[in-house]
Regions:
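Mid-to-C-terminal alpha-helical segments outside catalytic/metal-binding sites
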Residues: 1-17, 25-40, 51, 82, ...
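Acidic (Asp/Glu)-rich catalytic clusters
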Residues: 5-9, 29-36, 51-65, 79-88, ...
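Hydrophobic faces of well-ordered beta-strands that scaffold small-molecule active sites
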Residues: 14-18, 41-43, 65-68, 92-94, ...
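Conserved, mostly hydrophobic/aromatic
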Residues: 17, 34, 84, 92, ...
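Histidine/acidic-residue-rich catalytic or RNA/ligand-binding cores of hydrolases
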Residues: 24-28, 53, 131-135, 171-180, ...
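Active-site gating/metal-coordination segments in enzymes
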Residues: 48-143, 192-193
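Charged helix-capping and loop-helix junction motifs
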Residues: 103-112, 138-147, 200-213, 245
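His/Asp/Glu-enriched short active-site or ligand-binding loop at hydrolase and phosphoryl-transfer sites
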Residues: 185-199
């Protein structure tokens, strides 16, 4: 069977957030770990990594899903979106560290093209790290707030968006935006499941609307936790974060009493459905 066939057996796990560090040995180790876990991963690939990853994806499409890590402020961003699409990548991102707020009109043509191509998008939301504090940088976490996605989600209803880090620390806003925007999903990678480990029950207050019947909440929604998709945010080749993230997610879902069907959706089912729908709409191709 063609490994890119959207009708193939779904993997148990889909990690929507793995950064490539440029090292082909990392790719080999990642593939081995994913296959052992019956998992797939969305591999965030920068333009300089394009040729290397494109070749690798062709050989390992059973466990790797390409995401083009395009810079929103790159003058050549639209061309890179086309190149990633033509090469069989299924998504874009992680969009981050932009010179303007995410919802600035200058980025509209990029989001419009992504929606036309049905490319899944991953946005960094919330606080952003500062690895070199002595180096000046035009970066502001305020431009990356999860609330900046609201206008994008409404303007481009066909654009599937994953908000990485669930807006850390704006969790209430992130959950409420996901409640009203069917094209928004949330990932809990990063520090969130570390700092909340003493009482994961707090997530029940964020995802409060399961089974609620009210004119003040959308009708027909499944378990509110179904807005989550699994993510590890592996970067700098730190593959151990995959297993640590799995354990944190499973523990949180257990503490919150999330049912088995919803857990399966979070850990892989939802992401695989989105990818399969995207491929089916493209005639079985990326």
């Amino acid at each position: 069977m063609n490994p890119r066939d959207s009708s193939r057996r779904p993997p148990a796990i889909v990690d929507v957030h793995v950064h490539h560090n440029g090292d082909e040995d990392f790719l080999r180790r990642l593939v081995d770990r994913l296959r052992a876990a019956d998992a797939m991963a969305c591999l965030l690939t920068t333009p300089p990594q394009f040729d290397q990853v494109r070749r690798f994806l062709e050989q390992h499409a059973d466990c790797l899903i390409g995401f083009g890590d395009v810079r929103l402020d790159d003058p050549d961003a639209l061309n890179w979106i086309e190149r990633f699409h033509q090469a069989g990548f299924d998504g874009l991102g992680e969009f981050t560290s932009s010179a303007r707020p995410f919802d600035h009109p200058a980025y509209g043509p990029l989001f419009a093209r992504a929606a036309e191509l049905r490319l899944i998008t991953l946005f960094h939301t919330g606080i952003v790290f500062r690895p070199e504090p002595r180096v000046a940088a035009n970066i502001s976490s305020d431009r990356l707030r999860v609330t900046r996605l609201d206008a994008i989600l409404r303007q481009f209803p066909d654009l599937v968006v994953i908000a990485a880090h669930m807006g850390n620390p704006d969790y209430v806003w992130a959950a409420e935006l996901s409640r009203w925007n069917p094209n928004l999903y949330l990932d809990l990678s990063g520090s969130t499941l570390i700092k909340t480990a003493s009482d994961y029950r707090v997530f029940r207050s964020y995802f409060w609307w399961s089974g609620t019947v009210s004119p003040h909440t959308p009708l027909g929604q499944a378990d509110a936790f179904a807005k989550l998709v699994f993510a590890s945010d592996i970067f700098w080749g730190e593959l151990g974060e995959f297993d640590r993230s799995l354990e944190r997610h499973r523990r949180m879902l257990e503490v919150c009493g999330v049912d088995a069907v919803t857990r399966q959706a979070i850990m892989g089912g939802t992401a695989w459905r989105l990818i399969s729908e995207r491929r089916a709409a493209s005639g079985g191709k990326a």
